[in-house]
Protein backbone atom coordinates (compact mmCIF):
# COMPACT_ATOMS: atom_id res chain seq x y z
CA UNK A 1 0.00 0.00 0.00
CA UNK A 2 2.84 2.38 0.81
CA UNK A 3 4.59 1.54 -2.45
CA UNK A 4 1.43 2.25 -4.47
CA UNK A 5 1.00 5.59 -2.71
CA UNK A 6 4.67 6.46 -3.25
CA UNK A 7 4.48 5.64 -6.98
CA UNK A 8 1.06 7.12 -7.80
CA UNK A 9 0.28 9.65 -5.10
CA UNK A 10 -3.04 7.88 -4.46
CA UNK A 11 -3.93 5.48 -1.65
CA UNK A 12 -4.50 1.88 -2.63
CA UNK A 13 -8.15 2.13 -1.58
CA UNK A 14 -8.76 4.80 -4.24
CA UNK A 15 -7.28 2.53 -6.91
CA UNK A 16 -9.71 -0.18 -5.84
CA UNK A 17 -12.62 2.30 -5.88
CA UNK A 18 -11.73 3.39 -9.42
CA UNK A 19 -11.64 -0.11 -10.83
CA UNK A 20 -14.47 -1.09 -13.13
CA UNK A 21 -16.59 -3.89 -11.81
CA UNK A 22 -17.71 -6.25 -14.51
CA UNK A 23 -20.04 -9.15 -13.98
CA UNK A 24 -18.48 -12.57 -14.27
CA UNK A 25 -18.72 -14.13 -17.72
CA UNK A 26 -20.51 -17.11 -16.21
CA UNK A 27 -24.21 -17.66 -15.78
CA UNK A 28 -24.29 -18.13 -12.03
CA UNK A 29 -27.21 -19.57 -10.13
CA UNK A 30 -26.38 -19.22 -6.46
CA UNK A 31 -28.24 -21.20 -3.84
CA UNK A 32 -27.46 -21.10 -0.14
CA UNK A 33 -28.65 -22.97 2.92
CA UNK A 34 -29.69 -20.28 5.40
CA UNK A 35 -31.40 -21.52 8.56
CA UNK A 36 -34.33 -19.41 9.73
CA UNK A 37 -34.40 -20.81 13.27
CA UNK A 38 -31.33 -19.42 15.03
CA UNK A 39 -32.03 -21.37 18.23
CA UNK A 40 -32.05 -24.64 16.28
CA UNK A 41 -28.81 -23.66 14.55
CA UNK A 42 -27.19 -22.98 17.93
CA UNK A 43 -28.43 -26.32 19.27
CA UNK A 44 -27.00 -28.14 16.24
CA UNK A 45 -23.67 -26.35 16.65
CA UNK A 46 -23.49 -27.38 20.31
CA UNK A 47 -24.45 -30.94 19.39
CA UNK A 48 -21.78 -31.12 16.67
CA UNK A 49 -19.07 -29.66 18.91
CA UNK A 50 -19.94 -32.21 21.59
CA UNK A 51 -19.80 -35.00 19.02
CA UNK A 52 -16.33 -33.88 17.92
CA UNK A 53 -15.18 -34.01 21.53
CA UNK A 54 -16.65 -37.48 22.06
CA UNK A 55 -14.88 -38.66 18.91
CA UNK A 56 -11.48 -37.64 20.30
CA UNK A 57 -10.82 -34.06 19.26
CA UNK A 58 -8.71 -33.34 22.36
CA UNK A 59 -6.75 -36.56 21.80
CA UNK A 60 -6.09 -35.38 18.24
CA UNK A 61 -4.78 -32.08 19.61
CA UNK A 62 -2.49 -33.88 22.05
CA UNK A 63 -1.20 -36.14 19.26
CA UNK A 64 -0.47 -33.15 17.03
CA UNK A 65 1.45 -31.44 19.81
CA UNK A 66 3.51 -34.58 20.43
CA UNK A 67 4.19 -35.20 16.75
CA UNK A 68 5.11 -31.57 16.02
CA UNK A 69 6.89 -30.18 19.09
CA UNK A 70 7.56 -26.86 17.33
CA UNK A 71 3.82 -26.31 16.85
CA UNK A 72 2.57 -23.16 18.57
CA UNK A 73 -0.74 -21.37 18.98
CA UNK A 74 0.50 -18.84 16.41
CA UNK A 75 0.29 -21.29 13.50
CA UNK A 76 -2.62 -20.63 11.15
CA UNK A 77 -3.88 -24.18 11.64
CA UNK A 78 -4.07 -23.65 15.39
CA UNK A 79 -5.97 -20.37 15.04
CA UNK A 80 -8.98 -22.13 13.48
CA UNK A 81 -12.23 -22.32 15.40
CA UNK A 82 -12.10 -25.20 17.84
CA UNK A 83 -8.35 -25.67 17.66
CA UNK A 84 -7.71 -22.25 19.18
CA UNK A 85 -10.04 -22.99 22.08
CA UNK A 86 -8.55 -26.47 22.56
CA UNK A 87 -5.05 -25.01 22.62
CA UNK A 88 -6.09 -22.44 25.22
CA UNK A 89 -7.77 -25.16 27.29
CA UNK A 90 -4.66 -27.37 27.26
CA UNK A 91 -2.33 -24.47 28.04
CA UNK A 92 -4.36 -22.58 30.62
CA UNK A 93 -5.93 -25.42 32.52
CA UNK A 94 -9.33 -23.74 32.89
CA UNK A 95 -12.29 -26.06 33.31
CA UNK A 96 -13.63 -28.43 30.68
CA UNK A 97 -17.09 -26.81 30.73
CA UNK A 98 -15.50 -23.41 30.05
CA UNK A 99 -13.64 -24.93 27.10
CA UNK A 100 -16.87 -26.38 25.70
CA UNK A 101 -18.65 -23.03 26.13
CA UNK A 102 -15.81 -21.14 24.43
CA UNK A 103 -15.58 -23.61 21.55
CA UNK A 104 -19.32 -23.59 20.98
CA UNK A 105 -19.49 -19.78 21.17
CA UNK A 106 -16.63 -19.41 18.68
CA UNK A 107 -18.41 -21.77 16.28
CA UNK A 108 -21.65 -19.79 16.62
CA UNK A 109 -19.75 -16.58 15.87
CA UNK A 110 -18.22 -18.18 12.75
CA UNK A 111 -21.67 -19.31 11.59
CA UNK A 112 -22.99 -15.78 12.12
CA UNK A 113 -20.17 -14.29 10.01
CA UNK A 114 -20.82 -16.85 7.27
CA UNK A 115 -24.55 -16.08 7.24
CA UNK A 116 -23.83 -12.34 7.12
CA UNK A 117 -21.57 -12.90 4.12
CA UNK A 118 -24.19 -15.05 2.38
CA UNK A 119 -26.86 -12.39 2.87
CA UNK A 120 -24.66 -9.81 1.14
CA UNK A 121 -24.28 -11.76 -2.10
CA UNK A 122 -27.04 -12.02 -4.69
CA UNK A 123 -28.76 -15.35 -4.27
CA UNK A 124 -31.12 -16.96 -6.74
CA UNK A 125 -32.58 -18.92 -3.86
CA UNK A 126 -32.05 -19.52 -0.17
CA UNK A 127 -33.26 -22.69 1.47
CA UNK A 128 -33.77 -23.51 5.13
CA UNK A 129 -31.90 -26.73 5.92
CA UNK A 130 -34.10 -27.31 8.98
CA UNK A 131 -37.41 -26.97 7.16
CA UNK A 132 -39.45 -30.05 6.38
CA UNK A 133 -38.90 -29.55 2.65
CA UNK A 134 -36.46 -31.67 0.72
CA UNK A 135 -33.98 -28.87 0.05
CA UNK A 136 -31.77 -31.01 -2.19
CA UNK A 137 -34.67 -31.72 -4.51
CA UNK A 138 -35.75 -28.06 -4.43
CA UNK A 139 -32.23 -26.89 -5.27
CA UNK A 140 -31.97 -29.42 -8.09
CA UNK A 141 -35.27 -28.27 -9.58
CA UNK A 142 -34.19 -24.64 -9.30
CA UNK A 143 -30.95 -25.33 -11.17
CA UNK A 144 -32.75 -27.33 -13.85
CA UNK A 145 -35.27 -24.55 -14.35
CA UNK A 146 -32.58 -21.84 -14.49
CA UNK A 147 -30.48 -23.67 -17.06
CA UNK A 148 -33.43 -25.11 -19.00
CA UNK A 149 -32.53 -28.71 -18.31
Positions of the model-derived regions?
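Catalytic core of IPPT-family isopentenyl/dimethylallyl transferases
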Residues: 23-149
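Phosphate/Mg2+-binding loops and adjacent switch elements
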Residues: 2-28
Amino acid sequence: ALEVFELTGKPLSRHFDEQQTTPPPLDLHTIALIPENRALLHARIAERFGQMLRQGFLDEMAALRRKYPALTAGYTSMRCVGYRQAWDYIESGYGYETFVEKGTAATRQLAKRQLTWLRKIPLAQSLDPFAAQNYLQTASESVKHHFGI
